[in-house]
Amino acid sequence: MAEVKLLGFWYSPFTHRVEWALKLKGVKYEYIEEDRDNKSSLLLQSNPVHKKVPVLIHNGKPIVESMVILEYIDETFEGPSILPKDPYDRALARFWSKFLGDKVAAVVNTFFRKGEEQEKGKEEVYEMLKVLDNELKDKKFFVGDKFGFADIAANLVGFWLGVFEEGYGVVLVTSEKFPNFSRWRDEYINCSQVKESLPSRDELLAFFRARFQAVVASISAPK
């Protein structure tokens, strides 16, 4: 039987994408938790360019970058399709995946800014949410009638964003401002396939609050 290993961080939305795909396909795998501050030689050898997770190792061969890994899993293993079969729908799914990937840094960085810089960051995130809200009008999922590639690409805004908001005390999403996105987010969180692989919300809150405090302390420390 093919050997499959996944190197990841338990708190990472990018690791979660791969876990979701493997479970959807019914692939048995060994999960290896990495230490952010002391990365293993296996990780550094498997991803020498970026030195980051997730990394999927299949029969000794490493595949990196979460959305690339998802396509690899979809093409390699039997089971339900992750990408749509229709070429146009596949293109749409890849478009929204790229759009969301380009916005990840803006979403995360907003929580580590203060004052005017944070307000600028919020506006950038609001613009992204407006686009998503408009796209999700009268739609249950991003592409087609089932949860798929584009939806899992949106996992950071689907679940982690809410954790960041609560942990850092910065509210970006309300059902009044973004009703369609909020409805989709509820669908995302309650999707049985997703719930099975999501980390504990309470543990994530504790982890990110501690990280936030550490960042603030380092910024405030005398030089």
Swiss-Prot record:
Transmembrane segments: none annotated. The keyword Coiled coil does not apply. It is an enzyme of class 2 (transferase). GO terms for cellular component: cytoplasm. GO terms for biological process: auxin-activated signaling pathway; glutathione metabolic process. It comes from the Eukaryota. Pfam families: GST_C (PF00043), GST_N (PF02798). Residues 86-212 form the GST C-terminal domain. Keywords: Auxin signaling pathway, Transferase. The keyword Transferase applies. It catalyses: RX + glutathione = an S-substituted glutathione + a halide anion + H(+). Glutathione binds at residues 12, 39, 53, 65-66. Belongs to the GST superfamily. HSP26 family. This is Probable glutathione S-transferase. It comes from Nicotiana tabacum (Common tobacco). The lineage of its organism: Eukaryota, Viridiplantae, Streptophyta, Embryophyta, Tracheophyta.
